[in-house]
Regions:
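ABC-family P-loop ATPase nucleotide-binding domain
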Residues: 1-13, 305-310
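ABC transporter nucleotide-binding domains
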Residues: 4-7, 14-212
Length: 310
């Protein structure tokens, strides 16, 4: 018998005035997976997660968390979930240890405060005031507050936004350790590398709807192209899109201002004829970059916009 889903969302809608924050969203998150909600700011990710956390009310649709619903089972659900908000405001004057003892007192069971402090690598800071912690330490502290009740399901809203690369990787390690214990994680992010590393499956959300769903590998494979060539040209005649599409191995052509993007199968198949074409037109590359296709490219190909655009 398949395990019941950790989170089940059907026909979820939420309006703020005339704005549709969430517009008929359907999702099912399996027990034990790390699931990513991916999308630009304003896509409806945070609203969806807040409704799942019981912090916000849907206008219509059903949301079932761990087989329960907030309207009838809030007291049962609260101790079973952990929540790390986009910005967690903790009492600045309390120490790390005092804060975690306070949060631990809200739950019947769970790990000791010492265990959690060790897990999030804040042993050396246990007597420091929360206000003295760095950005990365504060994010690990927020995660510790979410873990102290030993949750079955962990909600992380943009857990590494604003962190330096080292702090981001430390937090990724902690999330992976939590998932390795068979727990479920729902995270929102607009960092593609984060989603590709942590998530078993992702849903790409835009304008409050799921526009793509699958493993990171499946979604990238759906592009049909392994590489992206990005270039700008020196002054001169620019080839038109049809000429570019006629080159070997080109699946799609996009333009953003002066920049031209080609989604291609193999570099050796496309670059030599591209160089010949540009030479014939009396122009050349002002700038040239290539990268392996990512979830960012999937999003751009679906929406025509970058994930980082406000």
């Amino acid at each position: 018998v398949p395990a019941q889903p950790a989170v089940s969302i059907h026909g979820l809608r939420k309006f703020y005035g005339d704005t549709r924050a969430v517009d008929g969203l359907d999702l099912e998150i399996r027990t034990g997976e790390c699931f990513g909600l991916l999308g630009p700011n304003g896509a409806g990710k945070t609203t969806t997660v807040e409704i799942c956390e019981g912090l916000n009310q849907p206008d219509s649709g059903t949301v079932t968390i761990l087989g329960r619903q907030w309207a009838t089972d809030a007291a049962d659900l609260r101790p079973r979930i952990g929540v790390s908000l986009q910005e967690t405001q903790l009492a600045e004057k309390l120490t790390v240890e005092e804060t975690l003892r306070l949060f631990r007192s809200f739950y019947h069971g769970g790990p000791t405060v010492d265990t959690v402090i060790g897990q999030v690598q804040l042993n050396e800071k246990r007597r420091s005031r929360v206000g003295q912690l760095s950005g990365g330490q504060k994010q690990r502290m927020a995660l510790a507050c979410a873990l102290v009740g030993d949750p079955e399901l962990l909600f992380l809203d943009e857990p590494t936004t604003g962190l330096d690369p080292q702090s981001r990787r430390q937090l990724w390690d902690l999330i992976e350790q939590f998932k390795a214990q068979g727990r479920t994680v729902l995270l929102t992010t607009h960092y593609m590398e984060e989603a590709e590393r942590l998530c078993d499956r992702v849903a790409i959300v835009d304008h409050g709807r799921v526009i793509a769903l699958g493993t990171p590998c499946e979604l990238i494979a759906s592009l049909g192209s392994e590489h992206v060539v990005e270039f700008t040209l020196l002054d001169g005649k620019s080839p038109d899109d049809n000429e570019l599409r006629a080159l070997g191995g080109v699946h799609a052509v996009r333009r953003t201002g002066e920049r031209i993007f080609l989604e291609i199968s193999q570099l050796h198949e496309t670059l030599p004829p591209l160089l010949n074409m540009l030479e014939r037109l009396g122009t050349g590359f002002a700038e040239l970059r290539t990268h392996t296709a990512t979830l960012e490219d999937v999003f751009v190909s679906l929406t025509g916009r970058s994930l980082r655009e406000e």
